[in-house]
């Protein structure tokens, strides 16, 4: 597991969650994603599952930051529920 990449993603999520210019729903989503992603550091997960989770969160980060008019879907790792986050 690449802890440096996870740490970098966590920093981006935490910064997004604290930006006043970001929509409150997005800030909450970023904070929730950071919490879930931080659990990966302490959890031993299957490599393919990890890659899928990482891909989902990278897409979520990019969409939160660059595509404000579109909703994003991210996976909650514990319950595999889907969340749709709107502007």
Question: How should these model regions be labeled?
Answer:
Residues 52-87:
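Amphipathic alpha-helical binding modules
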Residues 2-31:
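N-terminal acidic leader/helix
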Residues 18-28, 42-50, 66-73:
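Charged, low-complexity interaction regions
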Residues 10-13, 30-38, 57, 61, ...:
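Generic L/I/V-rich hydrophobic alpha-helical segments across diverse proteins
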Residues 8, 14, 22-23, 50, ...:
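General helical secondary-structure elements
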């Amino acid at each position: 597991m690449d802890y440096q990449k996870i740490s970098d993603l966590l920093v981006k999520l935490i910064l997004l969650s604290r930006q006043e210019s970001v929509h409150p729903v997005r800030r909450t989503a970023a904070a929730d994603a950071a919490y879930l992603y931080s659990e990966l550091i302490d959890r031993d997960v299957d490599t393919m599952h990890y890659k899928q989770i990482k891909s989902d969160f990278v897409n979520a980060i990019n969409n939160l930051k660059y595509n404000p008019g579109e909703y994003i879907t991210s996976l909650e790792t514990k319950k595999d529920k889907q969340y749709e986050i709107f502007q």
